Amino acid sequence: ESVKLKESGKVKEVVAISIGEDKAQESIRKALAVGADKGIHVKIDSYVEPLGIAKILKKIVEKEKPDMVFLGKQAIDDDCNQTGQMLAALLNWPQATFTSKVNLKDKSIEIIREIDEGLETVEVNLPAVVTCDLRLNEPRFASLPNIMKAKKKPLEQIDASELGIDTKPRIEQIKVEEPPKRKAGIKVANVEELVQKLKN
């Protein structure tokens, strides 16, 4: 979405950030290949909770001074849906969550978000934190020439320990387990048989 805004002339620069092990650079290179201008990799080898991620991002935001920060609404590993909200609180910025459509204005951003009752339109002043829903856009595929160009774009690496942030976990994970296996279903020949089985 940031790249689309840049292509429309409303945004000057797109910076892609990833926090994690060395393999996190792959995500940044993909972002550079589809149009981001530069990347920042904050290297940390241990698991970081959403609050720790938000603290790291706050440091980067204070250095880069963007007008907007786009994040996914939740991570695929822990599904927490907390980082964007925590970042907005730490920065004391307005936030727009679960965004499925964006309209950037002069000093504000209007977003559409999906809620239980339908679609809600919200406008927040800039600078702002925006968390994005999957419906916001279709992922782009990078062409081979753009993949090659991405290798020449700047990718800064920062060690998380240099930021002076406490990223120690506040939550103790006791265990993770798969859900119990379901019993096999019963096939029925027709609706009448199904009704009988449901009655009994």
What is the predicted function of each stretch?
Residues 1-200:
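N-terminal glycine-rich FAD/FM-binding segment characteristic of electron-transfer flavoproteins
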